[in-house]
UniProtKB/Swiss-Prot annotation:
Protein name listed in UniProt: Putative double-stranded DNA mimic protein plu2488
Family: Belongs to the putative dsDNA mimic protein family.
SUPFAM superfamilies the UniProt entry points to: Putative dsDNA mimic (SSF102816)
Organism: Photorhabdus laumondii subsp. laumondii (strain DSM 15139 / CIP 105565 / TT01)
Function according to Swiss-Prot or TrEMBL: May act as a double-stranded DNA (dsDNA) mimic. Probably regulates the activity of a dsDNA-binding protein.
Database matches in InterPro entries: dsDNA_mimic_put, Put_dsDNA_mimic_sf
């Protein structure tokens, strides 16, 4: 797979794309109670964080996600506006290269 450093999504575009994917697939992968909780609380306590891919992804994908091209987006709820996300609804490994719309999601169990 040829990836181009000059054809990457920005961090904001990556967060937006990951969140759009989350919204599209959440109803098929999350418990209805979790969907309701997330919907009711997102404006107050919700968030999405962009991180380099963690080593944990090596257990779930058959390649090493290069941080130049892949990001991990965590979507969930925090205890307060200033706190870190502690109730994770999805971890999304997403390719930032625009011509390779690759992603993998680990859903809340």
């Amino acid at each position: 797979m040829d990836l181009d450093l000059n054809n990457r999504m920005t961090e904001d575009e990556t967060l937006e794309k990951a969140y759009d994917i989350f919204l599209e697939l959440a109803s098929f992968n999350l418990d209805p109670a979790d969907i309701l909780l997330f919907s009711l609380q997102f404006e107050i306590r919700g968030g999405a964080e962009l991180l380099p891919p963690s080593d944990g992804w090596l257990k779930h994908v058959d390649f090493n996600p290069n941080p130049d091209f892949f990001a991990e987006v965590i979507i969930g709820l925090a205890e307060s506006e200033d706190a870190e996300i502690n109730d994770v609804f999805a971890r999304i490994l997403i390719c930032r290269e625009k011509s390779h719309p690759i992603y993998h999601i680990l859903w809340k169990e």
